């Protein structure tokens, strides 16, 4: 069961909170106070949506997802915490993201100690969230910046250099890696990231699910056998799976 709360602060910040019934109101209030304290220092006003839900595969685990929008910055963060002891981690991550946007600092470092990989072996789990978007046509380094801004583990987009679906994701040795469907052209922005040299697997949706769950993968970028488009299948904190796919036909096909 989901519980919705809404409030506003003295500096004009409008706050909406959605929490799972297993997450106490006291925990939600502490989280609101922590992030409001950060935003109060910047005096941006704006609107904040905070969602708190239990992590089904971790005792006392909570995942906090925060979306903040103001005339100055737009921030999305997602961070797992252990019970109420990790509330400050939400505020710290928000502060870091805002400062990086305001100062133009480089992408966050990887590995990220606040965001352990959500990957574990399990029986085949269902896809409980499907996201269909008109994918943005981006240069790979811009896609990496979008991934960082919205605190994604991986980001699906149309690669401006090849015209194909592609993903960027956090991985060594440079922190960001690019995976393309089949065209393994060298990057025009050399040194920004590494490129996965292996063409993307062509799979059915069910085969992709089996691969993620059998091998404990946090996500899988694959080409769907039905239409030849790229898909991003990922493990959710709730334990089930999510799928991201594009709506429009990619250019250059």
What are these regions (language model features)?
Residues 1-253:
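N-terminal, polar/charged subdomain of small-to-medium soluble alpha/beta proteins
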